[in-house]
Each structure stands twice: as C-alpha cells, then as structure tokens.
Amino acid sequence: MALGYIQRYLPECLRLGHSRSTLRLKMIRSMPRYLLALLFLLTAMPFAKTALATTSCSPLLSHTFPRLQDEAPQNLCQYQGKVILVVNTASFCGFTSQYEGLEKLYAKYKDRGLVVLGFPSNDFGQQEPGSNKDIADFCKNTYDVKFPMFAKSSVSGSNPNPLFKMLIAKTGTTPKWNFYKYLIDRNGNVVDSFGSMTKPASSSITGEIEKLLGEKI
C-alpha cells in the first residue's frame, strides 16, 4: 500500500518540477500516519538486526584477556561469528615450530572467517619462562606471527584461565602439553579438540575448518 502511494504521488511531483529535497518533504507531510509508521519500521529493522547480532555473544567467548603485545584488554566477543582455533603455545618446546603452520593456516582462511587465538603458557615443562614482551618479540621475530596472541596465563591444573576452564568442561579434555588445539564454530560452540602431535596443516584440522566455514550462522 505504501509503495502504491509513492508510485501515484511521485510522477505528479516530478511533473510539477519539485526538487528532490522538496519532493521528499512533500511526500512525508502528505503521507497518512500509518504509512509513516510503516516506513519507519522498515527503515529501522536492518539496524535493529545488526545491533542484535553485535550484542549477542556466546558464553564461551564472554571473556576479556590482555593482548600479548601491550596488555590492552581484548574481549573475545569480537570473534563471535568466526571459526576459532584456540591454541596454548610455548616458545621453547619441541612443537614450537607449529607457529609457522598456525600462521599459514590463519593466512589461508582468515578472509573466509577463521581466526587463530594463541595463549602462551608456562604450564608444561616450564617452556614459556619469559615475559609477555619476550614472548611477543620471539613470535614476531622468529615466525612473524600475525594472528591474535594473549598474555601468558595458565591453561591447565587447578586454575586455568576462564576460556580454557570452559573448553575443558565442555570437551572433557584438558591440554596435555603445549600446542593443544580447540576448534570453535561460528556460533561459539566448541566442536573438536586436537592433540599436540596434530599439525595445523593436517587434514583432520583443515577438513573440519573447511566444513565449519561453509556453515551458516
């Protein structure tokens, strides 16, 4: 009905030579109130939908951690809607070379919606003894890591950080060593975990990532 009204009114206004701004004002003034209300609702709906999507966050991601480089607080809700690979890392481990594979994985899939999140930890073999700055410098200078990294924290034992505490509870699997991996879907649900021996480029990881990237939210 609103469209019909506009279609009837528009040609007449154009015939009379109204400017675009004058035309818009005359149309609005002459519209019945119910049409104005309908027009407002139709205009507001996309913004409401966007706001709802922005504010909705999975409990699994409702945590804030300091960024590794500068300890600026980072809310994990910013990654809602992405496929997420969470990894506990260490600088002096036999699996440290997996940084290279993780960075390649991130570079390959990030434009399709994958993000890798690194959580340095000194829990296993005391293989992450340095400061956050030491770790950040090592990651940058040795592997040119660009995926998000967070300040050193515990990921196992009696006091794991809040994210790993939830990952452990939901999977029933605790990290057994450095470079343990948890895969989270676009809706913020953990769907799988992989041991330290499973390389980032393995088909078990990439196949699952491909599948999750293809799923709609």
Role assignments for model-derived ranges:
Residues 49-77, 97, 162:
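N-terminal "domain-start" segment that seeds a small globular fold
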Residues 162-165, 169-217:
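Thiol-/selenol-based redox modules, centered on thioredoxin-like
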Residues 88-92:
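Amphipathic alpha-helical repeat scaffolds
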Residues 80-84, 110-115, 143-148, 178, ...:
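Loop/turn elements at helix/coil->beta-strand transitions in domains of secreted/extracellular proteins
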Residues 5-9, 18:
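Low-complexity, intrinsically disordered or signal/transmembrane-proximal segments
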Residues 95-160:
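Structural microenvironment flanking redox-active thiols in thiol-disulfide oxidoreductases
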Residues 36-46:
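Bacterial N-terminal signal peptides
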Residues 13, 21, 25-36:
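Bacterial N-terminal signal peptides that target proteins for export
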